[in-house]
UniProtKB/Swiss-Prot annotation:
Keywords attached to this entry: ANK repeat, Host cytoplasm, Lyase, NAD, Repeat, Secreted, Toxin, Virulence
Catalytic activity, as annotated: L-arginyl-[protein] + NAD(+) = ADP-riboxanated L-argininyl-[protein] + nicotinamide + NH4(+) + H(+)
UniProt: NAD(+) binding residues: H143, Q144, S145, N155, K157, T169, N172, T173
GO molecular function: ADP-riboxanase activity; toxin activity
Gene: ospC3
UniProt cross-references to InterPro entries, sorted A to Z: Ankyrin_rpt-contain_sf, OspC1-4
Listed name of the protein: Arginine ADP-riboxanase OspC3
Amino acid sequence: MKIPEAVNHINVQNNIDLVDGKTNPNKATKALQKNILRVTNSSSSGISEKHLDHCANTVKNFLRKSIAAQSYSKMFSQGTSFKSLNLSIEAPSGARSSFRSLEHLDKVSRHYISEIIQKVHPLSSDERLLLSIIINSNFNFRHQSNSNLSNNILNIKSFDKMQSENIQTHKNTYSEDIKEISNHDFVFFGVEISNHQEKLPLNKTHHTVDFGANAYIIDHDSPYGYMTLTDHFDNAIPPVFYHEHQSFFLDNFKEVVDEVSRYVHGNQGKTDVPIFNTKDMRLGIGLHLIDFIRKSKDQGFREFCYNKNIDPVSLDRIINFVFQLEYHIPRMLSTDNFKKIKLRDISLEDAIKASNYEEINNKVTDKKMAHQALAYSLGNKKADIALYLLSKFNFTKQDVAEMEKMNNNRYCNLYDVEYLLSKDGANYKVLEYFINNGLVDVNKKFQKANSGDTMLDNAMKSKDSKMIDFLLKNGAILGKRFEI
């Protein structure tokens, strides 16, 4: 097992360069030109299948690199957090992003490696051994979702790409993430230490959150991925009582259970979240773990970490207790090398929010369940599922009346169907279907939330011009509260 000499050398920056292996930014371009020239020169004598595969892979790798450059350009140029930390770059002047953003990622990664090396240098023999174990460990990357993302091929798309393709599904990316770190063109993964003998996955939550009933696991990283030690936006490690494997630590250790809750950050304060490229990520994890162990007053925990025979599961427990590792792949992952593991059943509402048609069809087998499903669709503003259900089942006005009487659906308990059809963010196409097919009365006054209002009141409040125009054309009037 080999440890980079950088961790024990006095000249930190020089050795950072050794760890990173500074590359010629034109190397990929020159290699591509060389391969294209080779193909051109050999065209007269025929091209072997081996050469065709090589050329195809060269083009594929070039495209993958170009896409990654676009994702990083967006993140580093638009994220306000990077600007405040003086880690931003200028937005590309043209439509395409240059590879400069990838070079910037490497520079940022080297910066954070250098920063942590300066904190922990020099290492003891126990620390060197632990670092070597981490550096030589294999990782699994886990993406959880209630969506059905695979059919022999696993396809996971970033939030930004799904938006560009008008794909409607439950989102875990919010406006604050986009504004501050602008990493919404990446696919997110939890990280765990690979152990071929243990049942996968080792963890089922990330940052205390259960992101879905399906775990999609890959054992290969991306040359253009990046890792953070925590959730990139929320870098606070939660208290021990929120951890998935809390009993392991509460039963075995004392002081460390009170030490773990903290912000993980760099030298510029708690908003300074360390970022490591794929090449540096194991080194970054190991050095930051050593820094935490040094500060811990828990002797039992320290001895446990420095056990030379530590097994992969125990190492994973430590790393995902001290940190909450998050790995990010630019824009999209598409692979046939993966495992899909169902962790639990998916509720009907979660299946609807995730646009999981397979699960919906398995659960909605009669009109009674269709009532539930339609109510969940309207409550969650899932127009795609609502229109799908309306096309599959012959809904009548009586069905709508029965929906409103359901006492086991919170949306129907709190709201009239007319309110759900016209609330802020509702899709006017669904409203159009209901009115055109006589399923609701255009001027029925709400009996539950906002009692006395009508659908036109809701549309006016949200300033939905399409919905307002459609309602007015169908004779809609305002409710009593707005009458003069």
